[in-house]
């Protein structure tokens, strides 16, 4: 993530968790179980998943909040290390380890990796291949060109990948070559030129697991934002719901400000809100923006939408779905969402239209 987008993520999270939570729903769902005397606390972390994490929670004391946040932070950093595809860590077997051993040997991994990979494989089928973590060879090419563009001082020097190189890399994206042995707890890439890229699932899955662990430790009322991926735990002490917002993709800037706007605000209790957009990670060639959401069919940035948001009880599934939906037609996406219980979506099209799934309005702030 560039410095500009890092600042954007920080301010986006602050606005999502500050402005929107200040005016939560006055509905009275089932009691959150948190004490009516609980106080509101907040904290920010900067060292997980290359983005900004902000948490707001209601706790009975600052000591309780600190205990909860220390544990949540430690959990998040553990997932960060497990899902890293670029770096090694002492004593840690992670996704990079799996990639390094492609075609060599199965790698025994932690359950936190197995669970994430199983979800990704399931969502590959759900999205008819539009969510494919086996596309690492193709995504690495785009990543390298984007990184080179960020290093350029002259935009005119930015370049695009050659189609021939993309086609060659695409021959090593068959997810059937991802071999998972649940009994032995091993993962093996049978194609030596294949690599995993879990950017479309890792953060969302981690947020879900971290939230569930926090709940198991007794946290009853919180809103977690990791780079804008929102996950609500329970309700506020007064019974009102948390709130989240979908950023206006046409008003998004490198530095997010109070003048930026939302196309929708939703009420959230034990729900996740995740957005994927073409304004988040990109570079420009000849005046055209080339973002990071690559269509598996074309091997180029998907052009169906400017952003897609998913509201779901599960943050991991929501993360996968935003990527999958971004890379498929509106008609196919609507059919998919209507087939999933408790899941809603919002699409922002290149011509400025905002389209909601049939149940989105039930969650929308009035």
Model-inferred region functions:
Residues 2-366:
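Mature catalytic core of soluble alpha/beta enzymes
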């Amino acid at each position: 993530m560039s410095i500009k987008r890092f600042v954007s993520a920080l301010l986006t999270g602050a606005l999502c968790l500050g402005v929107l939570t200040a005016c939560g729903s006055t509905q009275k769902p089932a009691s959150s179980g948190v004490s009516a005397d609980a106080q509101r606390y907040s904290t920010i972390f900067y060292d997980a998943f290359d983005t900004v994490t902000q948490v707001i929670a209601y706790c009975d004391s600052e000591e309780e909040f600190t205990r909860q946040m220390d544990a949540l932070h430690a959990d998040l950093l553990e997932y960060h290390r497990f899902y890293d595809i670029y770096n090694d860590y002492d004593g840690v077997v992670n996704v990079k380890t799996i990639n390094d051993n492609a075609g060599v040997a199965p790698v025994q991994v932690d359950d936190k990796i197995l669970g994430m990979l199983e979800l990704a494989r399931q969502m590959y089928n759900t999205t008819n291949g539009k969510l494919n973590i086996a596309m690492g060879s193709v995504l690495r090419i785009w990543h390298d060109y984007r990184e080179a563009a960020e290093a350029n001082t002259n935009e005119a020097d930015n370049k695009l990948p050659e189609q021939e190189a993309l086609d060659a890399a695409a021959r090593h994206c068959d997810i059937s070559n991802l071999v998972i042995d649940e009994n032995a707890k091993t993962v093996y890439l049978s194609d030596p030129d294949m690599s995993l890229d879990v950017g479309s699932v890792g953060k969302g899955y981690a947020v879900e697991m971290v939230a569930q662990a926090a709940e198991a430790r007794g946290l009853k009322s919180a809103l977690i934002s990791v780079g804008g991926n929102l996950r609500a735990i329970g309700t506020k002490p007064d019974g009102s719901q948390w709130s989240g917002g979908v950023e206006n993709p046409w008003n998004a800037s490198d530095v997010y400000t109070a003048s930026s706007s939302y196309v929708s605000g939703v009420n959230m209790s034990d729900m996740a809100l995740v957005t994927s957009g073409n304004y988040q990670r990109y570079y420009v060639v000849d005046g055209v923006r080339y973002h990071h959401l690559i269509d598996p069919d074309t091997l180029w940035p998907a052009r169906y939408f400017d952003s897609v948001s998913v509201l779901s009880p599960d943050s991991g599934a929501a993360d996968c779905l935003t990527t999958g939906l971004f890379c498929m037609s509106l008609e196919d996406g609507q059919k998919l969402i209507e087939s999933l219980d408790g899941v809603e979506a919002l699409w922002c099209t290149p011509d400025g239209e905002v389209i909601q799934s049939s149940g989105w309005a039930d969650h929308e702030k009035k």
